């Protein structure tokens, strides 16, 4: 299984990185608020909140920001927005399928911005089900590979119920069934493995391999969608050769 479609990133100048950091914090805060609202403000009894907080800490979010987000979500502090989940399906250039997950307090704004961004990037919105049939919900745990024994990780994950472990270079990716995510994550923690994130994701069943030119177009469109405030996650079914990925990383 290729990891390119999940881990492909392009390098940005410092200003762009700083801007993305601010947007990342906003997305992480939304995740924390929603998790606390749905499952309560105690991370020990709310695995989704535990993972949302853990991911925010990994991104170096200040502890005070995290604590306030938990309180807002749990109703202990005013200021929480009334977010709703919306999922859009779309196409990028070269027939690449996109699933765009939004958390928004304004459905009309989210729809207009997603549609406009897709159109400007030579993509389009798709009817419900026309893209998602090629994806399936999975749990995904990302483990930094440095200093980690792959065989030990694989054995620990498999015994806990994981479906697969792949070597994606700087990280190992543990794939689970959606209901097994927390069990496998806990088993890895107890075995001493550090991890970057544990999330529910949409994994493509089939991937489209792109040329450098098409990969540039699709990457730019996904970046522009990710910049939208209402967009939380984007999943796609594109991949590319190692040579193409190396060229993208240099740009």
Swiss-Prot record:
GO terms for biological process: regulation of DNA-templated transcription. The keyword Transcription applies. It is found in: Cytoplasm. This is Probable transcriptional regulatory protein BL0726. NCBIfam families: PRK00110.1 (NF001030), PRK12378.1 (NF009044), YebC/PmpR family DNA-binding transcriptional regulator (TIGR01033). One of its GO terms (cellular component) is cytosol. Keywords: Cytoplasm, DNA-binding, Transcription, Transcription regulation. Belongs to the TACO1 family. Pfam families: TACO1_YebC_N (PF20772), Transcrip_reg (PF01709). The keyword DNA-binding applies. One of its GO terms (molecular function) is DNA binding.
């Amino acid at each position: 299984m290729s990891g390119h479609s999940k881990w492909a990133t392009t390098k940005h100048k410092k200003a762009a990185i700083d801007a993305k950091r601010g947007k990342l914090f906003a997305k992480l805060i939304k995740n924390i608020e929603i998790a606390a609202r749905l499952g309560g403000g105690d991370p020990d009894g709310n695995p989704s909140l535990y993972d949302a907080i853990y991911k925010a800490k990994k991104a170096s979010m200040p502890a005070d920001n995290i604590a306030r987000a938990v309180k807002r979500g749990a109703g202990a502090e005013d200021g929480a927005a009334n977010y709703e989940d919306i999922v859009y399906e779309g196409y990028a250039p070269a027939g690449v399928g996109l699933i765009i997950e939004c958390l928004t307090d304004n459905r009309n704004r989210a729809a207009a911005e997603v549609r406009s961004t897709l159109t400007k990037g030579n993509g389009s919105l798709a009817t419900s089900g026309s893209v998602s049939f090629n994806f399936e919900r999975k749990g995904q745990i990302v483990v930094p590979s440095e200093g980690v024994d792959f065989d030990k990780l694989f054995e620990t994950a498999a015994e806990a119920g994981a479906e697969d472990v792949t070597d994606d270079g700087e990280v190992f990716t543990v794939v689970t069934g959606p209901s097994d995510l927390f069990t496998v994550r806990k088993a890895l923690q107890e075995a001493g493995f550090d991890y970057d994130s544990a999330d529910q994701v949409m994994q493509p069943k089939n991937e489209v391999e792109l040329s450098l030119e098409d990969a540039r177009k699709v990457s730019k469109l996904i970046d522009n969608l990710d910049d939208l405030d209402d967009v939380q996650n984007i999943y796609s079914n594109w991949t590319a050769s190692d040579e193409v990925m190396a060229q993208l990383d240099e740009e």
